Design a protein with these regions (language model features):
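Acidic, contiguous segments within the catalytic cores of piggyBac-derived transposases
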Residues: 1-263
Length: 263
């Protein structure tokens, strides 16, 4: 499963509107989302409504609350640097999860050797129990925590742009490869929602939320039906089919004898 953020577009005035530069829609209402890492089906979500209220809102509290329905089932959990920390990963292992995620280099508990500068392709690994921390130099420094991988490099295919001329195998840390595969689910669902937004500029924020969640439900249903039927129906075609069936149902709704016609 994957823990990540999604965005419901909204540019009006509201106390808990956020800005997220890496999303297709930059301004809106943020959702914390748990999704199936393989197909992107959203399993659980929570809307961010600011720091008000009695609910604990530290990053660790948020992650543990979001993952509570899935504990003790040996799930791999993918998350990005906003959530990850050695302390959180220890808590998640105690609850039966195997977390994997990029991590901020400033997080408390990371090895001091991670301050060393590396040349491209170099790597530093440090293990504590079943948690592996690594720093790897690609185009930039990559910091990763994983409880599901060994300290090894794996081949990812041919690099056709070798500087020295000729092809050579591209090697990446196993944890980085696993993370890249596991993080696509929510990103794909969020991108699909941005392609087919159900919104108008004049609606209130709560209507934005309703239509945002309605869109999420339709995307979920499209993915589920494709899995069940072994098909690959595009979301656009699926939405047109839904609209057609709803329109036909409206036209064929029988009238009640004796009922007054609406003006």
């Amino acid at each position: 499963i994957t823990l990540d953020e999604a965005m419901i577009p909204f540019r009006g005035r509201i106390a808990f509107k956020v800005y997220m530069k890496n999303k297709p829609n930059k301004y809106g209402i943020r959702l914390e989302v748990v999704a199936d890492a393989e197909n992107g089906i959203v399993l659980h979500f929570e809307a961010y409504t600011g720091a008000a209220g009695n609910q604990a809102n530290t990053v660790d509290d948020l992650v543990l609350r979001m993952l509570e329905p899935f504990k003790d089932k040996n799930f791999l959990v993918f998350m990005d640097r906003r959530y990850s920390s050695p302390n959180l990963f220890t808590k998640l292992r105690q609850k039966g999860f195997y977390p994997v995620g990029t991590v901020m280099k400033s997080r408390r508990g990371l090895p001091k050797s991670f301050t060393r500068k590396l040349r491209k392709g170099q790597i530093i690994n440090r293990r504590k129990g079943d948690m592996l921390a690594l720093k790897w130099k690609d185009k930039r420094d990559v910091f990763l925590l994983t409880t599901a991988d060994r300290a090894e490099m794996v081949e990812t295919g041919q690099n056709r742009h070798a500087q020295a001329g000729g092809d050579h195998e591209t090697l990446k840390p196993a944890g980085v490869v696993r993370y890249n595969l596991g993080k696509v689910g929510v990103d794909r669902a969020d991108q699909m929602a941005s392609y087919y937004p159900m919104h108008r500029k004049t609606v209130k924020w709560w209507k934005k939320v309703f239509f945002g969640l309605f869109t999420m439900a339709l995307i979920n249903l499209n993915k589920y039906m494709n899995m069940k039927n072994g098909s690959a129906m595009r979301l656009e075609t699926f939405l047109l089919n839904i609209a057609t069936h709803l329109g036909n149902a409206e036209l064929s709704t029988p009238t009640i004898p004796g009922a007054a016609a609406e003006p």
